[in-house]
From Swiss-Prot:
Keyword Repeat: no
Highest taxon, organism lineage: Eukaryota
Coiled-coil intervals: none
Chain ranges for the short sequence motif Prevents secretion from ER as given in the UniProt record: 389-392
Name this protein carries in UniProt: Protein O-glucosyltransferase 1
GO BP terms in the entry: axial mesoderm development; circulatory system development; gastrulation; muscle tissue development; paraxial mesoderm development; positive regulation of Notch signaling pathway; protein O-linked glycosylation; protein O-linked glycosylation via serine
Gene of this entry: POGLUT1
Organism of this sequence: Homo sapiens (Human)
Catalytic activity annotation: L-seryl-[EGF-like domain protein] + UDP-alpha-D-xylose = 3-O-(beta-D-xylosyl)-L-seryl-[EGF-like domain protein] + UDP + H(+); L-seryl-[EGF-like domain protein] + UDP-alpha-D-glucose = 3-O-(beta-D-glucosyl)-L-seryl-[EGF-like domain protein] + UDP + H(+)
Function text: Dual specificity glycosyltransferase that catalyzes the transfer of glucose and xylose from UDP-glucose and UDP-xylose, respectively, to a serine residue found in the consensus sequence of C-X-S-X-P-C. Specifically targets extracellular EGF repeats of protein such as CRB2, F7, F9 and NOTCH2. Acts as a positive regulator of Notch signaling by mediating O-glucosylation of Notch, leading to regulate muscle development. Notch glucosylation does not affect Notch ligand binding.
Length: 392
């Protein structure tokens, strides 16, 4: 073999193949240049937010309350209550009162937990809190009226609040979550443990999704999975509305999968449901790369999560999903960095203290726009912390 080391043939082959290899590298780099440039621009423009006093989300509160800077009158509030756009609450003398009716008691209980956490520092006020899935105040409605909702699009004036699901009343998924997903602080710990068991290098590189067909926007991913199962593993599960295989695109429903078991996969998909999806925040804590489909529906913390910085944005019709998956597979280090930034953001800025802090800041700012003194309504029940309810 010594002749090969100094052979003119070897030199000729090296000179012949080197330009070809360089060309392939250049071609590969240029193929993904649009995505790489987009990531670099997004990182250059990104300003990390402070962890102090949940100030990360102050801009959301300011924007949501802007329509009410002219003041909220007693007459306006009476109209909101009359129209039954949500559950009416009053705070007087650091006590919380509520009308008798609540459409979803566990959801109201989840909301009340956080208000009671900060009740001692809140001024008198009253508000209507919508615990339905859908926002109530479209922008074409004039004048804007104050209704609190957990999720909305840019077409609504609703005031976003941290959803009840951070404490209780989350979506029940039979049989794995029969009473809902449970407390966010405890679920965080489970997901972080699972992420540690499945570091990036051990994760399956097939894209993954399990969920019910709450929106047909999910259909293209399911169909892509059936066509190319090595690229995507996506199946529909049952929900309460399931009646036949028509509701799962002609195939039997898949078994539900615990969210902690999603951490085995590098690429996880988040879609809107009826409104914003409750799974979004959970997926990040797997340390996986989140593919977020569409950008219309928001919860209060969404605006600080930035595309290309914390997650991969996907067009609503999924027309670019195959190209995006090919990109992250070809640029594994880049994909891992985005996944790590997304995970760190949720770990650092969406702790339970941040939720409580947001509630306090939101209600304190909102109360400044009430142009009248609140009078407690007769017949309203005082809401007492659950730990005290065993006294009787």
């Amino acid at each position: 073999m010594e002749w090969w080391a100094s052979s003119p043939l070897r030199l000729w082959l090296l000179l012949f193949l080197l330009p070809s290899a360089q060309g392939r590298q250049k071609e590969s780099g240029s193929k993904w240049k649009v995505f790489i440039d987009q990531i670099n621009r997004s990182l250059e423009n990104y300003e990390p937010c402070s962890s102090q006093n949940c100030s990360c989300y102050h801009g959301v509160i300011e924007e949501d309350l802007t329509p009410f800077r002219g003041g909220i009158s007693r007459k306006m509030m009476a109209e909101v209550v009359r129209r039954k756009l949500g559950t009416h609450y009053q705070i007087t003398k650091n006590r919380l009162y509520r009308e008798n009716d609540c459409m979803f008691p566990s959801r109201c209980s989840g909301v009340e937990h956080f208000i009671l956490e900060v009740i001692g520092r809140l001024p008198d006020m009253e508000m209507v809190i919508n615990v339905r899935d859908y926002p109530q105040v479209p922008k074409w409605m004039e004048p804007a009226i104050p209704v609190f909702s957990f999720s909305k699009t840019s077409e609504y004036h609703d005031i976003m609040y941290p959803a009840w699901t951070f404490w209780e009343g989350g979506p029940a998924v039979w049989p794995i979550y029969p009473t809902g997903l449970g407390r966010w602080d405890l679920f965080r710990e489970d997901l972080v443990r699972s992420a540690a068991q499945w570091p990036w290098k051990k994760k399956n590189s097939t894209a993954y999704f399990r969920g019910s067909r709450t929106s047909p926007e999910r259909d293209p991913l399911i169909l892509l999975s059936r066509k190319n199962p090595k690229l995507v593993d996506a199946e529909y599960t049952k929900n309460q509305a399931w009646k036949s295989m028509k509701d799962t695109l002609g195939k039997p429903a898949a078994k539900d999968v615990h969210l902690v078991d999603h951490c085995k996969y590098k690429y996880l998909f988040n879609f809107r449901g009826v409104a914003a999806s409750f799974r979004f925040k959970h997926l990040f804590l797997c340390g996986s790369l989140v593919f977020h489909v569409g950008d219309e529906w928001l919860e209060f913390f969404y605006p600080q999560l930035k595309p290309w910085v914390h997650y991969i944005p996907v067009k609503t019709d999924l027309s670019n999903v195959q190209e995006l998956l090919q990109f992250v597979k070809a640029n594994d280090d880049v994909a891992q960095e985005i996944a790590e930034r997304g995970s760190q953001f949720i770990r650092n800025h969406l702790q339970m203290d941040d939720i409580t802090c947001y509630w306090e800041n939101l209600l304190s700012e909102y109360s400044k726009f009430l142009s009248y003194n609140v009078t407690r309504r007769k017949g309203y029940d005082q809401i007492i912390p659950k730990m005290l309810k065993t006294e009787l």
